[in-house]
Swiss-Prot record:
It catalyses: alpha-D-mannose 1-phosphate + GTP + H(+) = GDP-alpha-D-mannose + diphosphate. Belongs to the transferase hexapeptide repeat family. GO terms for cellular component: cytoplasm. The lineage of its organism: Eukaryota, Fungi, Dikarya, Ascomycota, Pezizomycotina. It is found in: Cytoplasm. It comes from Aspergillus fumigatus (strain ATCC MYA-4609 / CBS 101355 / FGSC A1100 / Af293) (Neosartorya fumigata). It is an enzyme of class 2 (transferase). One of its GO terms (biological process) is GDP-mannose biosynthetic process. Pathway: Nucleotide-sugar biosynthesis; GDP-alpha-D-mannose biosynthesis; GDP-alpha-D-mannose from alpha-D-mannose 1-phosphate (GTP route): step 1/1. This is Mannose-1-phosphate guanyltransferase. The gene is mpg1. Involved in cell wall synthesis where it is required for glycosylation. Involved in cell cycle progression through cell-size checkpoint.
Amino acid sequence: MKALILVGGFGTRLRPLTLTLPKPLVEFGNRPMILHQVESLAAAGVTDIVLAVNYRPDVMVAALKKYEEQYNVRIEFSVESEPLGTAGPLKLAEKILGKDDSPFFVLNSDIICDYPFKQLAEFHKKHGDEGTIVVTKVDEPSKYGVVVHKPNHPSRIDRFVEKPVEFVGNRINAGIYILNPSVLKRIELRPTSIEQETFPAICSDGQLHSFDLEGFWMDVGQPKDFLTGTCLYLTSLAKRNSKLLAPNSEPYVYGGNVMVDPSAKIGKNCRIGPNVVIGPNVVVGDGVRLQRCVLLENSKVKDHAWIKSTIVGWNSSVGKWARLENVTVLGDDVTIADEVYVNGGSILPHKSIKQNIDVPAIIM
């Protein structure tokens, strides 16, 4: 089987982290974000994976080629000379995606969930039509494009309603699809949208179905959602009693859902959790309080610091008695001085912060 991952461009929504690494390589749950998808695709029997990229492809190639042997897959890069939207990349990769009659998966690289690739392939084969979209239920459908089904048919899609004022349904496009190669004939090699152009055309021919996603789902393309997605991911691991989580018997674990890389060092009298990820070679001092946060590789948190709803970037340092909260994001190599308060700052790489940031701000 084949798959195309829409990696896309600059990852501006996840800055300042994406100023250092392309978004798919930013660690989510202590692994590059895209590796969660590659691993799940390989487990479902996918052998050919195409990454559609238009930003720093050289970095992506160097980072991901080593995983081919590990997962027994071929990873190829389809490099766009100009951004081609969400449908154009399929046409650009037509030689691979259309090389045989078997269907192929398409997914957005920002999506973290319990990937249902095997079940999705079985469902798609069973109905025999041209395409299947994975959908997820949301509490506030008025914020999204909603999938509406044909009367008396539970899966065949009738139409899409963008940000409906009146309730028409609560299922939204989850950014994961399986399509027959015939779909490629519907797409031109130009910047084009699969959601706004390709899917409505398949829909009008009665050839598009939906597949309900069970379990958690999150688009983690911006810091607030990255943190929420981390909580959902850790909760999912806890339900499966995953060995990736620190046991609750550890003296520093407070409230559960804590992931700690084996190379990290944690001081005395710390309270960590719930929903914390601590990366490789991180050093946490004594008496530190961490909750709902991510500490990326080589970062350092000094004694008695208090951190909540924050992403601490690679090689960054948080001073003694400092307090960070309210979706604060530190880029690479940021230094927060002792006793400094940061209330929602987005701080670009290599900055040194010696004064309080009382209201959310971008520090350049």
